């Protein structure tokens, strides 16, 4: 396999784009690379569902993403709150798109299928770019939550989405000099650039923890996220067909990759949540007993005035009689 070719990748991993790249079949005339093994379909309520196990994990991922978003939104004054929540919104959109594709809501060989796969690729690139820009927020190079910070991350993510979407669509449709057999640009955008973005983010967070934080526990979150992410990629691209054969086509590497990606995203949240401190003076907590009185006021700071006016409707009021000697009379 030459650089930028998907032949060996698609023979092991049943990726959605594999049916849109590669040489044309001499029999059917359609493009696509058939994997050695892929998960069997399941029938539910007279509906055929592709990749049932992976689709189930996508649904779990949606629920977990909603929980993480709610937790981020509850930290009103946390550093990088608006920036990191953009990352989770993009991940939610990517999960929904992947669920639609993997479950067969938009089946392969259908007209809209190339467009959905192009959107999936675009969201994948946007997600990695958003993660990259989030890596700079902790260094306070610019104030977080401002117009510059929020729209910088939104615009860069949108630009990478458009670039990846267009390259994918041009490749699938043989437009602009690209073709399903000329996939170098697609490979660079999906794998090389995304890998560079993730690597830079990891380096930035390591520098942030080592140079600015006394606590080293966040390194555990980073390490666990990296390990599970790498395991998911290895299981997908290295052992997907082996797993599929050994479990009688009930699972394949896509299931494990989806699950490991979810764990990696959760570690991104845990890392951000751990290193983020909130200004409690201006926050609105969702937990009871957020505030705690540590000690009573000193005795000398308490009011010592005794109120004697029992006829007033305000038990706490006091009337002082003026003692004037004007004109020799007391008033």
UniProtKB/Swiss-Prot annotation:
List the Pfam families hit by this protein, alphabetically: Chs7 (PF12271)
Tagged with keyword Ribonucleoprotein: no
The Gene Ontology CC terms held by the record are: endoplasmic reticulum membrane
Any one GO molecular-function label of the UniProt entry = unfolded protein binding
Instruction: Alphabetically list the UniProt keywords.
Output: Cell wall biogenesis/degradation, Endoplasmic reticulum, Membrane, Protein transport, Transmembrane, Transmembrane helix, Transport
InterPro entries documented for this protein:
Chs7
Q: What biological-process GO terms show up in the record?
A: cell wall organization; chitin biosynthetic process; protein folding; protein transport
Membrane protein topology class: Multi-pass membrane protein
Q: Where does the UniProt annotation locate this protein?
A: Endoplasmic reticulum membrane
Q: Which domain of life is it from?
A: Eukaryota
| Oligomeric form and interacting partners | Interacts with chs3.
Q: What is this protein called?
A: Chitin synthase export chaperone
Species of provenance: Aspergillus fumigatus (strain ATCC MYA-4609 / CBS 101355 / FGSC A1100 / Af293) (Neosartorya fumigata)
